[in-house]
Each structure stands twice: as C-alpha cells, then as structure tokens.
Amino acid sequence: MTKVNPHFAKKLQKFGAKTVFQCFSCGTCTAVCSLASDDQQFPRRFVRYVQLGLEDKINHSVEPWLCYYCGDCQKNCPRKADPGELMMALRRYLTSIYDWTGLSVRLYTSKVWEIISVIVLFLATLAVVYALHGPIVLDHTELETFAPRHIVDPAGWIFGGVLSIILLSNIYRMYRFIMGDQKVKIPASLYVQELATLIYHFATQRRFGLCKDNRRWIKHWLLMSGYAVAFILVNAFSKWFLTNEFLSIFHPVRLLGYYATIALLYVTTESIVSRLKKSEPIHQYSHSTDWMFLILLWLTAFTGLLVHVFKYLDLPLPTYYTFAIHLAFTVPLLALEVPFTKWAHLAYRPFALYFVRLRERALEIQRADGGLSSVEISG
C-alpha cells in the first residue's frame, strides 16, 4: 500500500520547490523534455507525486537524477510552475536522504548551519596551519619548508579517505533505495560488465549533450575536468606543487595546473554572472547551497592561482599566507560539497545511469530466458 505524506510539498519548499501547486498537469514539460522517455517520464509525473505526497515513491525513484535541467520545461511551462527547479529540489532532497549523517539536510534547509559550518571549517584549518607550519623563510620563497610534505600529504590522504568513505556509503544507500525492491534479479557479473557505463558517463558527462542547447555540456565538462585534473595533480604530483623549487611555467605539470585553474575560474565566473543576471532558465532561481558551492570553488581556484603567482615572483610572506587561506577555502569546499551537497551530484548522476543500465540488461537476460515480460524501470 502506497504511503502518503500530505506535508511533503511543504517539506520540499525548504529544498527550493516553491511553485509546485501552480502546475495543472498539462504535460507540456514532459512533452518538450529531450531527456524523458517512455520508461523514464518526467518532470510532470514527479510534480504530481509531490502534489499527492508520494514521498516513499520519490525516495525509491531514479528519474530525478536523469534530469539534467536543460531548461526547456522552464521556458515552455504555461503556468510558470518551474518544473526544472522542482526536479532540482528533488535532487537536493534525495541527497539528504542518502546521507546517513544528517548533515546534508541541515545544510540544505538551514542557512545558519551552512554559514556556521563554512566559518568553523575555515577557522579550524587556519588554526591547524598555524599550529603545524614549518619554519618561515623570508630570504626567498620555500613553500615546502613552510608546509612540510610529510605533514600535508598524509593529512590530505586521511581527509580524502574519510570523505570517500562517507560518499561511498551514501552511494550504497542510494543503491538500496533505488535497487532494493527489484522484480528482476541482477546477476553479479553485470555489475562488473556495466562498469564501462559508469566510467563513460562520469568522464564525459555526455547526457548533458542531449539537451537541445548543449553549451551547458561543454561548460559542465570543463568544470568537471578542471576539478579532476586539479585533484589528480594535488594528490599524485604534489612534489611538483608543494616544493621549494621553481618549475618552468612550461613544465607539463604546470600546464595542466593552468588548464585546471582557467577551467574552474571561467565556468564559476560565468555561472555567478548568469545567476546574478538570471539570464538562463536554470539560473533564475538559486538555492543558498548553489552560492556556497560557486563562491567556495571560485575562491579556492583564485587563491591557488595567487599562490603560484606569488611564488613565481618570489614573495615569501604573500605566498605562505595565501597558501594558508587557500587551504582554509579548500577544506570546507571538499568537506561540505563532496559528500553532502552540490558536488555529490557528480557521483550520483553517473551511478543512477549505471543502475538504470543494470536493470535494462537484467531484464533483457530474463526475457531471453523466458522470464518476466516487463518491468518498471523506475522502481
């Protein structure tokens, strides 16, 4: 028996869904959506789910992750019910129920929690740097002397390990919600065989390209690739970044670093300007966590660039101070965004497509064996 929560629509307002009852279920949004299909129909179906309070059905659905907010539904809705923003609010809500720590729901529904969390992590990072930094050399810039790699590297690995464990455990909870009540048994071998689907969609973000205006795919790929390159460089090639030596600006590692910085600064700056101007349908409404993500990412990339400039100019104190501030922005960005809010979408979206593909393949196998003739892909 389907459970109904009559207060669900009000609950979802805190996640950004403000106009759900303006929808009269005409279906225009689903008709113009280039990503909807016969098996995965949205946004209208989910607007209706919210109106009816079908919280449990939403909790076990994969479709909100298959929506990439192209913006066509926003532009064509005759009631201005903002169906794209509703799907965005559902993704925030689902992120909060996958998270077992309870921090995600607090960050999404309380600006006070959000701001205090950033401030506490920022100040705590500065305090740690103050307590553990090495000698301050003023004759010339010695960044590794100020921030010894034997401290920075293990701290980064532990920090990254903790965040990875939290995110992976949340992904497992996502799996349990979406795949827990299966009508088709999925062979264990399929999980390995379909890993290519997961890797492909994570690396290419190709589903963005299915939107009628695929410029967002290019921007999103630049953002994702810039972050991925920066992450790999910092973790695998730190000896070239956290060093007392002055590498040539044409060193391959430096060039990759420039690409990552330019990509991150370009996309975040463009997104901030677009949100301020409300120039695109997807930027007409901004949740506080959208701003937190963009501002922290921009400041992290910009201070990282300043560290490089000051070091290249051999300005010791500006280099050390800016490096400390850079870390102080990086920690809340990663600690809050990766497992709990906006950045988690980078994991949930490709995993959602992976889960859908697993269901499709399992159904094909069962049909070939004379089993079920159909299955509800959306769960």
Predicted features and spans:
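Iron-sulfur-cluster electron-transfer modules
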Residues: 20, 37, 47-239, 243-246
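Flexible metal-binding regulatory segments at protein termini and peripheral loops
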Residues: 1, 91, 95, 379
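Charge-dense polyanion-binding interfaces
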Residues: 250, 260, 361-379
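Secondary-structure capping and boundary motifs in well-ordered enzyme cores
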Residues: 22-25, 59-62, 66-69, 258-261, ...
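Ferredoxin-type iron-sulfur electron-transfer modules and their immediate structural context
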Residues: 1-64, 346, 360-363, 373-377
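Helix-loop boundary elements of multi-pass alpha-helical membrane proteins
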Residues: 207-209, 277-281
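Hydrophobic alpha-helical transmembrane segments of multi-pass small-molecule transporters/permeases
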Residues: 28, 32, 72, 76, ...
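Hydrophobic cores of alpha-helical transmembrane segments in multi-pass integral membrane proteins
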Residues: 116-130, 155-173, 193, 197, ...
